[in-house]
């Protein structure tokens, strides 16, 4: 994760390790966008400690880059829980 992105997600109280963990745990992709030859995905995921995160990733040349991440809000939490119970 780039330094600017680390600072950005830190403002939301999230660490890079939490982002990577939620991604590795098989996130639910709820929206896909294409912007400037990039595929952005809005994802809902959970850390090993049960923290629910929303994050946006870009997949480029086989690598994943986190654009932003923040704690899930109510509607996202309901969608995630409904799909993963």
PLM regions: where:
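Ribonuclease/tRNase effector modules and their secretory precursors
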Residues: 1-85
